[in-house]
Design a protein with these regions (language model features):
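Structured interaction and signal-relay segments at domain junctions
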Residues: 1-77, 204
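Alpha-helix boundary/capping detector
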Residues: 45-46, 60, 115, 172-179
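Sensory/regulatory domains in signal-transduction proteins
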Residues: 62-115, 130-153
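A short, charged helix-loop
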Residues: 115-126
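Signal-transducing coiled-coil/dimerization helices and immediately adjacent hinge/linker segments
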Residues: 130-204
Length: 204
């Protein structure tokens, strides 16, 4: 089962965009195999233009995306989140994001990260200054609220799809039974006609 099988992706994109606009957090939805299924909302230059644009930075980012859950500090020092979207106990996708600071940054630590990733330090710090600062409590609450909302949408979409398919199977079953009954009736009429002919021949 895949998230996109039971949820309207355009609706998912609107929810994601509204979440990012309201909270200042970045967000994007991924399928169960990690592929992006929506466009990123509120992504920062710090992450996309600099960190992920370096070979080592991208390797570390992908590792975080694939291995981290809940809310966590990414390798570059920002706070991110990854919330699983579940259906009947099975993971069908996730929403990941964050790209915010829980407090004012220590510039020297980020300069060290820039050196490790072979990124221009001054440009990195300028991009860092544009990153939103949110309390850790607010980040946690926002991430899990989005997760709950998407899981509820997922359940509703699944139920709608399942019930629709169930009704279609019932209709198909009724049509099949009707066709079968018509065939039986037709065969019965043929048998009756044959029996009548045989009786007439027997009388002659």
């Amino acid at each position: 089962m895949e998230l996109k099988d039971f949820m309207d992706l355009s609706k998912l994109q609107k929810i994601q965009n509204a979440f990012s606009d309201a909270t200042g957090l970045a967000a994007i939805a991924v399928g169960k195999n990690g592929e992006y299924i929506t466009e990123g909302s509120n992504f920062t230059d710090f992450c996309m233009k600099y960190t992920r644009n370096s070979t080592e930075g991208n390797r570390r980012c992908v590792k975080c995306d694939n291995e981290c859950t809940g809310t966590y500090y990414c390798h570059a020092g920002l706070m991110d989140f990854a919330i699983d979207i579940m259906l009947n106990g099975e993971k069908v996708g996730a929403v990941i994001g964050g790209q915010v600071l829980p407090k004012d940054p220590d510039e020297e630590k980020f300069r060290q990260v820039a050196r490790e990733l072979s990124i221009d330090e001054d440009e990195y710090i300028e991009a860092l200054k544009k990153v939103n600062v949110r309390s850790e409590e607010g980040i946690n609450a926002s991430a899990f609220l989005l997760g709950d909302a998407l899981n509820n949408c997922m359940d509703a979409g699944y139920n709608e799809t399942y019930n629709g398919r169930l009704m279609q199977r019932i209709k198909d079953g009724i049509a099949e039974c009707k066709g079968l009954m018509e065939n039986i009736e037709g065969n019965t009429n043929q048998l009756n006609a044959i029996q009548s002919q045989q009786k007439m021949l027997a009388l002659n």
